[in-house]
Each structure stands twice: as C-alpha cells, then as structure tokens.
Amino acid sequence: MKYIILIGDGMADHPLEELGGMTALQKANTPNMDQMTKNGLAGLAINVPEGYSPGSDVANMSVMGYDPALYYSGRAPLEAASMGIPLEVNDVAFRCNLITIRDGLITDHSAGHITSEEARELIEAVDAELGSEGLKFYPGISYRHLLVASNGLGANADCTPPHDVIDGEINDHMPRGDGSDVLGKLIEGSIPILEGHPINEKRISEGKNPGNSVWFWGQGYAPSFRTFEDLYGLTGSVISAVDLIMGLGIYAGLDVIEVPGATGYLDTNYVGKAEFAMASLKDKDFVVVHVEAPDEAGHMGDIEAKLQAIEDFDEKVVGTVLRAARESDEDYTIVVLPDHPTPIALRTHTSEPVPFVMYSTLEDEVDDVETFDEDAMKKGSLGIVRGCDLVQLMMERAKQA
C-alpha cells in the first residue's frame, strides 16, 4: 500500500454573499475531489489544537502526523532547516517578511509578492547595514526571509504575523516583551534603507508594492523530532515550494523533492508536483504534496483567484494523482484536505476543523457524502478527528481494506 496526502493550503472558507451564501469550496468546480468523496470516507480534521494560533506551521505539522503539543517550537526554525541555515543551541530564528507600509499602515504582508531576485538584494542591503555578529539576515524566497539572533534574543517576544493585521497601524503591532527593543529598532532601521533602494523605486514606478520594511514573527529554537519512519514505519517524501513545509520534511527525515516551476503561488507547477509525487512512490511508501496557492488568494481577499486556485488544485494535482493511481498496479490510500481555513473576508487563518476525504483504490466502503466542502463533510462517517492522527488512520483503514 502507498499513502498520499494532498494539501490545498487554506482552501476552507466561510460563506460569502458574493457567492450566494456559498463558500469558495462549494462554488468551485471540483469534480475530482467530489468523486473521491462519493467513493471514499469523509470527516473533519482538527489541525489546530486548542491554545495554538492557526498558523500553517502548526496545521501542517498535524497533517504530517506530528502532535504540535510534542514537537512544535516555532515556525522559523523549520524554515531555517529548509534554507540550510544551522542553528546553534541558543540561536533564535525569526521569520522576516518584506512588507509594504503606507502612511503608517501595514498594507501588504508580501510586498506585492516580490520576486526572489529583488528580495535578495533588499535583504542583503538590510544585513549590510543592520546585521552584526549576533544578528544575521538570510534571504529566502519572495517575501519570506529569516533573521537569526544569538543568545536567546527575543525568544519570548510577542510578535504578530503581518497577514493577521493587514491595514493595521504599524506602531500598534510592533514586537513586545523580551528583546522587543532590539527587534523594534531593526524594523524601524530597515525602513530608510529599503525606501530609498533602487529596487523599490523601480517597483513603485511600475505600480507594484515596495518591500519597504522588514517584519519579524514565528520565532523559535531548533526543535527535536522523531523521524517519520521511526513513528510510522514508512519511508516518504514531501513536495512543496514553501520553506516551512520543506523544513518539516527535513526534521521528519523525509526526502524533500524540488519540482521545477513550483513557486508557492498561483502560477505554480501543479501537474509537475503531482507527477513527481507519483514517481517518488516507486521506492517510497508515503508522500505529502502541499500547494500554497489557495492560501495566498485568501490572504489577498481575492474571490476569483481563490476559486481558480482550488479548481487548479483539483484538476491538476488531485486529478493527475487519481488517474495515475487507477492506472497503477499498486494500491493507494489518498487523503485530500486543507491545513486550515483562510477565509476571503478575513484575509487570515482561522482554527475551525477542515473537511477531509480518505479514498482507497481497494476499499468499497463509502458514506453518504457526495461533495467536498465544509458543510457536507459534517455528515462524514469518520467524524471529527485530530489531524495528527490522520496518518495512523490511513494505515489502519488500509489494513481493513
């Protein structure tokens, strides 16, 4: 038996007047997820345990079979692993976004989805001016970068994700608590460096949002993980364009597969991700495929973009995987789900349970659910489960098939 988890990041949503009271999942054309639902078992997954913020770090850790209560130490250390940045015992890694501020407001958490090439120049300029022996900036992908601070600086600071406070006053959401004085000075110090940079002057002239400030959040120390194979007896791989997910894979001892054209955005190589996933199962037992596009559309508050991202995920990822599975001599158990909702109206994450379907090429047992959406799955025979139990549940169902 081979095991596949397909994650449409942020697909779940709330009803919208603009969609006649439907959610994006209900409105979108998703024949492949619906077909899986008609021929599989449905339920709701709690990927964000009570007491945790609904970040993609916590939610995807759960989906990949790890209880956040046992393994979570922060988002940025996972991203550091993906970027090949070593963390010493007392090092604290921070996510460092390039953001857009305008008239004292945080107007864009992604600096207009700035290119990685542009962003590298900006982060290198900030590091040259503000970096030191105990503070190092590392360029990453698009707007997603890292700051590593030594000696535990800011480990317990209260840092707010910028996508949670779009159109909020920058001064109302600056870091607070331990180490916040240093972090605040870095943010303030980055603004004159970035606002006058030729990269941003060019972006503004082209009508694009500039990356005119850095912003810190998601900090933590390096975590300690048991490997996925140790936990479940399965070898596996992870496919994503997002450093966070790749970092989870590294700590879990999974192979991290880089797919050409995978961008972490609406223009990603959906089909390539699915094809690489199926190829990986020739010598592995398990693969997780993560697609970021629906989440990005939710953060933008863009209804049409989210509908398109969901439909692309269904057609090009789920559809490609289903066709390959049915044509194969292998047996497969496949789960499809979001990690968390990213409601268009809120433009940020929420914590409620998300719909999931479990489909097997062997199993004849089905329930009465026919469409993949937030409401229909409430009637699913699998009920409400903890996300971190899904891998074990997949294995148990496979044994019963």
UniProtKB/Swiss-Prot annotation:
Keyword 4Fe-4S belongs to the record: no
Catalytic function, reaction form: (2R)-2-phosphoglycerate = (2R)-3-phosphoglycerate
Top enzyme class: isomerase
CDD domains in UniProt: iPGM_like (cd16011)
Keyword tags: Glycolysis, Isomerase
Pfam families, sorted: Metalloenzyme (PF01676), PhosphMutase (PF10143)
EC number assigned by the record: 5.4.2.12
Record-linked PANTHER family: 2,3-BISPHOSPHOGLYCERATE-INDEPENDENT PHOSPHOGLYCERATE MUTASE, COFACTOR-INDEPENDENT PHOSPHOGLYCERATE MUTASE
Function: Catalyzes the interconversion of 2-phosphoglycerate and 3-phosphoglycerate.
Designated name of the protein: 2,3-bisphosphoglycerate-independent phosphoglycerate mutase
Organism per entry: Methanococcoides burtonii (strain DSM 6242 / NBRC 107633 / OCM 468 / ACE-M)
